[in-house]
Amino acid sequence: SARDFAIENNAEDLLAFATSAIREAGNGAEVLQHVRRKTGVSLSGISGDQEAAITYFAVRRWQGWGAGRILNFDIGGGSFEFSTGTDALPDAAMSVPLGAGRLTREFFDEQPPSPKQTKRLRRYVREQIEPVAQRLLAFGEPNMVVGTSKTFRSLARICGAAPYSAGPHVKREMHVTDLR
């Protein structure tokens, strides 16, 4: 478990966060208490914007200070986090309720989805992302765009990137043209 790993590696603190699913659950507080009772780990519920900022910080540390302006995307099940910056903390970090699971449930009532459903979803996502994109791009063009989620890992794999089993230090790239 993450707790055992932290103990074995002499971590001074274990910081565990609960994201979109807990933020929106009617019984979120009960779930947090249950996890603490069963595991001894205290989860902290964080806002979507905090989630975006924490993810940005991890990306910045991984990519290094010389990476220039980073634009980070993180698609979860319930939310989509965006962040950008040139330093340890982001210039902007925000979250919108556009997670993959949420959108699938709300827009697709058949599998595979019909062209009409897909078109409706695309229109909706573009409308929701437009103000976010304007705010992020106001800080300047990114030197690097990073995707940090299983959704992006799966897309990169489909586009020919190395599999997850190749390890974390294998460079994986995906280009816009790969997605067309």
What are these regions (language model features)?
Residues 1-11, 15, 19-69, 84-180:
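Helical "lid/coupling" subdomains associated with nucleotide-phosphate turnover
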